[in-house]
């Protein structure tokens, strides 16, 4: 055993002062001295439980003792009679065994592969032990879940990630997926439940038993987000539902995750074999699957973006050459060739590396270096986490913990450890880059083209200086370009740029100037790019991105030239520069039906319990998607209708995620309203009005929302902090508003306006569905019924959605007096025009002035309210274009007029989008759009001016 280093010997005196009663410095072995000096977690644990220290001193932990975990836990749970005592025993057991593992690991009594195995077996033992105890308890309460033939149904648990691979780290989340075989009902209990309800309740209790912090701590943080549909999906799925999902909707990244999936516990029964057989074809293709390479390239980009996005330094998991890259290298071969090569189907990394070597898929030397690097990094990670039982992969900045790690890794000192670590990570990065490949560097021709611009950049030319490379510019443009460069250099002098940053900037600027100054709009483009560069000069990683990826630089120049809005966004949020790396996705927005799934995948990388990171991630995802939509808009690959469709689908995905986050937080605090025990869903809906309801969002639109619930009176929540059910939904809505409006370093998510709710700002923030129906029928004004024309549920369970749709249909199909309706709609429009219309007589406000967008919207709303009692089909859609179609199809408006209004509407909307991209207000010269305005005004007179 390596003697303690000097800093640790000094720290030992602090440890001695904290030793539990009955233990002295002389009574402890050298082994105990080493472990307690190294790990505060071990020290705190034996202070609380001195008998554990005596146990360890008398008999050291053994390599194969994981075989006894299940028996030991069974003994510990023998006297457990309720959930509270179960939770206490699980926490004690986990802590006791973790101290034993920390002891063995610190002293190298057991090799590092075995440590990973012990950590994984411990987690599996605790998961299975808790599941089995709770299954029996639930069966006593509700009966045994059976299929129609009376065969009892088990809860099967898939361990994902490192747990599935038998490679769990010391302080880790556990990723789980719950499943049960067949539908049916419980039998033999005090009350019957269908199997879905039984297993959902069992799953909820199991998560609580493992995850909920108590005075004794927690067992594991449980992450269920890898299940089908993530947080918005059922907690537990039947085999049939799982099979349907993975066959019809399974994504590439879910396939990657499923490579490591392993059933927990005794898994050789018929149900387990059936589930494995069902999942295998989804994971491993029968053919050599080279189609996966592009997806893997995208994953590589995601790793790099995550490191930049989170500002990760000294991170041995996510940094360049870290653990994640080794896992990625191995997965490349598993996913491409695993279907044809059974030896590649192992869930564990090291056996798969052996198979890669045996199949000669990588050179032997590369495999050997990856193996050594992996074991080195995993030991370093586990030692780091065992100091405080803390989930971290970032190297410490303090001297004590650095000394601890150097000693634990058998290095002479911290610099030696860092040197070894750097060598290992460089080896990994080399293999990683060779396997996937990076963008090509500059060609010799590009270098030659940019060389003359080096003089312009480095010699700080004055306004009146001449240089051949600027000769093609007009005199005024040349002066402005030189002024912009000079001002930029002065700005740089105020910034604390390190030597590496200046080196990269000097490398980047000649290329940038060569590209920008070859454009006719060089002055405008350079004026937009220099503020962005000034914002990132102290963040070398972004300068390197633009310098090392010429394609990204070209896209940056093109987009900034086209849109000051995009230039402003990139300057404000430099992490968006990552999006420029892949033109395949930059100009091709996410499919309209895939935003929820993309966001779910994005959020999986963020700890579920870290609210601040969750808020940041939501905002960063939105900004990245907005950039892609705007880029496609500029490139002309998205027509106006599609731009709004994408912006609307994106907003709906964000609403879904925000509600999920708020719901999780509220349920953790209060439990859920008890009426949900008798029904599926959450009894909650979000209704979108205005542009969101009408599929017509713009780049900077806010969201008009109202919130509904169906909670009866006198219902309470079922959590430890019990509150009234309706109060729960009010707090849920308040939480949602807070999550939308909180300003982080990435800004707010959306401005949300909830004033369209019953009684406006004076009304309750969340309304029961019955009260909403009553208000609409007896109290609402005509303008509120107009607003309802453009309303639809954007989040909600089917039951509440149907209820809202029925109320909306009833209100809209109510027979109205035509003259009265015409007068009320016209007068409301005149009031709006007086308040919101353009005050500049020489300008036309595209939205608010006569002949503008709002007039078209009012015509459509008036005609629906006027004629829907005769033609109920008019209530089907909430967007203006399809309402105009319906008016023509149902004989209310002739085809020519409907088509002409549609063209006018989309033309005006298109102009608004493009003005937004130019950061210009929504008005134009009076001479613009005269044809469209005349047409709209004629239609307005026809329908809404009294004859």
Curated annotation (Swiss-Prot):
Pfam families: GlnD_UR_UTase, GlnE. It catalyses: [glutamine synthetase]-O(4)-(5'-adenylyl)-L-tyrosine + phosphate = [glutamine synthetase]-L-tyrosine + ADP; [glutamine synthetase]-L-tyrosine + ATP = [glutamine synthetase]-O(4)-(5'-adenylyl)-L-tyrosine + diphosphate. Residues 450-947 are annotated as: Adenylyl transferase. It is an enzyme of class 2 (transferase). Its EC number is 2.7.7.89, 2.7.7.42. One of its GO terms (molecular function) is ATP binding. One of its GO terms (biological process) is regulation of glutamine family amino acid metabolic process. Residues 1-440 are annotated as: Adenylyl removase. InterPro entries: GlnE, GlnE_rpt_dom, NT_sf, PII_UdlTrfase/GS_AdlTrfase. SUPFAM superfamilies: Nucleotidyltransferase, Nucleotidyltransferase substrate binding subunit/domain. The keyword tRNA processing does not apply. Keywords: ATP-binding, Magnesium, Multifunctional enzyme, Nucleotide-binding, Nucleotidyltransferase, Transferase. GO terms for cellular component: cytosol. Its cofactor is Mg(2+). Belongs to the GlnE family. Involved in the regulation of glutamine synthetase GlnA, a key enzyme in the process to assimilate ammonia. When cellular nitrogen levels are high, the C-terminal adenylyl transferase (AT) inactivates GlnA by covalent transfer of an adenylyl group from ATP to specific tyrosine residue of GlnA, thus reducing its activity. Conversely, when nitrogen levels are low, the N-terminal adenylyl removase (AR) activates GlnA by removing the adenylyl group by phosphorolysis, increasing its activity. PANTHER family: BIFUNCTIONAL GLUTAMINE SYNTHETASE ADENYLYLTRANSFERASE_ADENYLYL-REMOVING ENZYME, GLUTAMINE SYNTHETASE ADENYLYLTRANSFERASE. This is Bifunctional glutamine synthetase adenylyltransferase/adenylyl-removing enzyme. It comes from Salmonella heidelberg (strain SL476). The gene is glnE.
